[in-house]
Amino acid sequence: MAREDASVPRSHDSADASPNSTAKEIPVPQPPLLNLNLNLNMNSGFNLSNWWHQITSIEADSSDDRNNNNSNNGINAAESDSAQSQPIVVLGHSYQTTEEAHEDIIKKLCLTYRYGFERIPRAVNGPSPLSFMQSVIFSKSLLYNLQNFNNFIEKENFTTDVGWGCMIRTSQSLLANTFVRLLDKQSDIIALFNDTYLAPFSLHNFIRVASSSPLKVKPGEWFGPNAASLSIKRLCDGYYDNSTSETILPRINVLISESTDLYDSQIAQLLEPSTETKGLLVLLPVRLGIDSINSYYFSSLLHLLSLEQSVGIAGGKPSSSFYFFGYQDNSLIYMDPHSAQIFSSDIDMSTYYATRYQRVDIGKLDPSMLIGVFIRDLTSYENFKKSCLDAANKIVHFHATERSTVPESRRKNSEFVNINRSDLKDEDYINIDRVNRLDSTDDFIDLGDDYVETNTNLEEATPSAEDTVPVSTLSASESEITTSSYETPTSKDDNSSRASLDVVVLDTTGEQQE
C-alpha cells in the first residue's frame, strides 16, 4: 500500500483551515474585545495592538457573516431534498432528525489547539517556533487574549501548537472518544490529555514518543497518520506497562495495520478472555487515493463510520486534519481542531466539546487518514467482520491466520531476497526454484513476506543449494524484476478489492513491464 511517509516534513496546517462546508453553531459567550485605539498614528511609532485589531477585525467580521449564514443550515443543510431525507449517522448510531443527532454530537470530546502550555524545547535542526508566528497572529482566538501575546511565542520553546498540531489533536480526539466507552467520567479522561508532560496522552508525550521512533518527528513538524498511530500505540502500551502510573482506564491493546489486513488468530490472541484486556483499538493508517479519495472507496468508508465499533477518523484535507465522526448522505460530519484556546492547569470541560461541527463532501477529502475501530471482545469482532464481509467492504480485509512471522513494521519490500521452495506453498504462488521454469511465467509474485509453513505435503527437508535462486543474480536475459506500488484502482469499475498492492513483475522477455 502506498502511504504517506510521516518522516517527511509536511507543509503546516493553517490556523483556521476548513474545507468547503456548512456549520452548526452552539451559542457560547465570548469575552468582550479589548478596548483598542483604532487610529494608527505612524508619527508616534508602530503600535502592535492597533495593527493587530485592524487586520483581525475584518477577518472576525467576515467570519461572523459566514457563521450567521451557515448557522441555520447545520448538518442537515443538504443540497437536495433527497439528501435531507437521509438519516444522520454518528459513530454507529442513526438519527432521523437533526435535533437527535445534535444531542449526541455535543457529547463528543474534541481537543483543539492550545496557547500557553508547558514549554516544549525546540529540536536541533527542527522548526523554529518563530516560523509559526503568522499562524498565531492570524488565529482569531488570540483576539481575546492579546494581553498574553508575549507568552505565546518564544524563540527556543513551543508554547502553542497553532500551525502544526492539528493531526495530534484529532488523534487525541479519536483516542479520547475511545476511552469514553471504557470510563463514564469524562473529566477523568480529559485529565489524561492535559498539555503537560505528566499527562500520559498529552501533546507533549505524543511528540516525545514520535521523536524517538523511526519516523523521528520533531516538535513543529506535521504528524501524518503513521506517526499518529505509532504514538497512540506507544503511549497506550507505556500507560499500562508503567507500574508507577495510576491506571484509571481498563487495559486495552492497540493494533496498527497499515495493510488493513486483520487476522482472526491475532485478534483472538489480543482479546484473550483470560487476560485483563477490555478491548482492542485497531488503527488503520491508510491512503485511499492520490489527490483525493478514490470513489471506489466511498461506500466502504461510510460503512465503517456506520458501525458501532467505529471511533472515528483523523485526517481530512491536505496539511490540515479534522476529526470525522459521522455522515449524512455523502457528506461527512467533522469537528475542527483549529480554533485555539488558552491552556489552563485547571481543566475547563466546556473547552473540550465542539462549539461547532461541520460537514464536507466525501469527494473533497484528502486520501491520507487514520481510521479507528474499537473492538470490545471476540463477539464484537465477529459482528464487525460479518458486517464488513456482508457489505463487501473494500478497505478492511480478513484472514484466518497470520501468513508472516515478520512484523509488519519491518516489511520494507525494498530489497531483493532469495526465494526458496519453502517460501512458496499454496496454489496462489508459483514455484520458481529453477530459472528455466520462468519461460512460461507471467504471474505476479509476492516477495514481501517470509511465509509460515502451512502445507504439510511440502518436502520437510532443507532445500539444497540448487533449489535456491538468488533473485539478485538473475541476468536481464533470464528475468527482469521490477517493483511497483499500486496505490488505488483508477476507476470504480476496477475489480481490485484491496486498498493497495505491492507486486513484483517477472518478465522473461528481458523488457521491463510498466
Curated annotation (Swiss-Prot):
SUPFAM superfamilies: Cysteine proteinases. Its EC number is 3.4.22.-. It catalyses: [protein]-C-terminal L-amino acid-glycyl-phosphatidylethanolamide + H2O = [protein]-C-terminal L-amino acid-glycine + a 1,2-diacyl-sn-glycero-3-phosphoethanolamine. It is found in: Cytoplasm; Nucleus; Preautophagosomal structure. Belongs to the peptidase C54 family. GO terms for biological process: aggrephagy; autophagosome assembly; mitophagy; piecemeal microautophagy of the nucleus; protein processing; protein transport. Residues 1-28, 61-84, 461-514 are annotated as: Disordered. InterPro entries: Papain-like_cys_pep_sf, Peptidase_C54, Peptidase_C54_cat. One of its GO terms (molecular function) is protein-phosphatidylethanolamide deconjugating activity. It is an enzyme of class 3 (hydrolase). Residues 472-489 have a biased composition (Low complexity). The active site is at C166, D336, H338. Cysteine protease that plays a key role in cytoplasm to vacuole transport (Cvt) and autophagy by mediating both proteolytic activation and delipidation of ATG8. Required for selective autophagic degradation of the nucleus (nucleophagy) as well as for mitophagy which contributes to regulate mitochondrial quantity and quality by eliminating the mitochondria to a basal level to fulfill cellular energy requirements and preventing excess ROS production. The protease activity is required for proteolytic activation of ATG8: cleaves the C-terminal amino acid of ATG8 to reveal a C-terminal glycine. Its main location: cytoplasm. Residues 1-15 have a biased composition (Basic and acidic residues). Keywords: Autophagy, Cytoplasm, Hydrolase, Nucleus, Protease, Protein transport, Thiol protease, Transport. It comes from the Eukaryota. This is Probable cysteine protease ATG4.
